[in-house]
Amino acid sequence: MPEARPLEAPASGEVAAIVAVQSALNERPEALTVAQGLSYFGEHSIGWLALSALGAVLSPRRRRGWLVAGGGAFAAHAAAVLVKRVVRRKRPHHPAVAVNVGTPSQLSFPSAHATSTTAAAILMSRAAGLPIGLGAAALVPPMALSRILLGVHYPSDVAAGVALGAAVAAVAVRLDVGLQRGVSI
């Protein structure tokens, strides 16, 4: 008699949420293409650094703000990497989840893409003189959803990344304002 193979548990909880997102967007191949593009853009916060540098060059009056945006995005990425190394949560691994992009590590919590994107959105809005919520509303949801669609993060990884990115942006603003006023933080 052949040896019985254990049945894979059905998707539940956060895995079920990933499967639901992937299933909902399965009929839209352009969504996957955009998600992969966002992944490459956000890798190691490179895209945000490039946009911040461009802003600093094109807007000399607002150069400081653009440099703070780039530094804040990079600091947010670094903070996410540090938290990943402490928490050590593995990326989603379930037969129902399609992994649609490569990753530099197997650690998932928090999403460094969501972290750096949130910090960049807040700080670049500030640098451009736009309402903070406008940049965050335009940039954060697509990146956050892309991490789930690509099958490389649980929703809680993304939510934690957004929170961490907002916290890093708040610290960056506080430091910048303090330095401009000559006040020690």
Regions inferred by a protein language model and the residue ranges of each:
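N-terminal transmembrane-helix/juxtamembrane module of multi-pass inner/ER membrane proteins
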Residues: 1-46, 80-106
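Membrane-water interface at transmembrane helix exits
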Residues: 22, 55, 80-88, 125, ...
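Membrane-helix interface segments
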Residues: 28-31, 61-65, 93-94, 128-132
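Alpha-helical transmembrane spans of integral membrane proteins, capturing the lipid-embedded, hydrophobic core
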Residues: 45, 49, 69, 73-77, ...
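Interfacial segments of alpha-helical transmembrane regions
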Residues: 55-78
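Small-polar-interrupted transmembrane alpha-helices in polytopic inner-membrane proteins
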Residues: 70-86, 134-146
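Membrane-embedded catalytic cores of phosphoryl/pyrophosphoryl-handling enzymes
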Residues: 96-185
